Amino acid sequence: QKKLEKVLKTFKVDTIYHAAASKHVPLVESNICEGARNNILGTLYVVKAAINEKVKNLVFISSDKAVRPTNIMGASKRFAELCLQVYKEKNPLTNFSIVRFGNVLASSGSVIPKFKQQIMEGGPVTLTHNDVARYFMTVPEAAQLVIQAGALGKNSEVFVLDMGKIIKIRDMIIKMINLAGQKLKDENNLDGDIEI
């Protein structure tokens, strides 16, 4: 926290975009203490440093998994959100905003490059369950949401992008297979190219 405060003071920081986190659910589930340390304590250090150095705005990048969390990663992000809300009540000089993201296409750790690679290698494409569905947003949409939250945020408001319809991952994989000039191989098409 002291090093962070020194950086904030040296560069007279006006706005912090706090995106550092352990965000991959399986990784956090198998490393609970490290995930909690990164997502909760890391956020707490940033919040305290921002307050101590009188930073005007702090935008916290959270997750859609913080809504009624069903895993450690989501719970740690929700706990971090609550920390911001508690500190805001006692420290009116720093504006806190919370941005909840779904899955950002082509971001680090996105499943899209993994699926693309599996298709290019001839499959199979790994899918945990046929009914899995997710919301997706583009990098420009995510960036716009973060910037708007920084400009508009007051009182630890939570900003969520309307991400439209939920997308079944299986349907998305089938479209990716077709776009690659291949055909799905399943019980209905044994002569196809790529299995899921």
Where are these regions (language model features)?
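Mid/C-terminal beta-alpha module of Rossmann-like enzyme folds, strongest
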Residues: 152-196
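Conserved Rossmann-fold cofactor-binding substructure of NAD(P)-dependent oxidoreductases
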Residues: 1-15
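A conserved pocket-lining segment of Rossmann-fold NAD(P)-dependent short-chain dehydrogenase/reductase
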Residues: 114-137, 141-169
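CheY-like receiver
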Residues: 7-11, 49, 145
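Conserved SDR Rossmann-fold cofactor-binding beta-strand/turn motif
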Residues: 100-102, 107
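Conserved Rossmann-fold NAD(P)-dependent oxidoreductase catalytic core, especially the SDR/UDP-sugar
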Residues: 12, 18, 22-81, 86, ...
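Active-site-adjacent segment of SDR/Rossmann-fold oxidoreductases
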Residues: 86-94, 119-120, 153
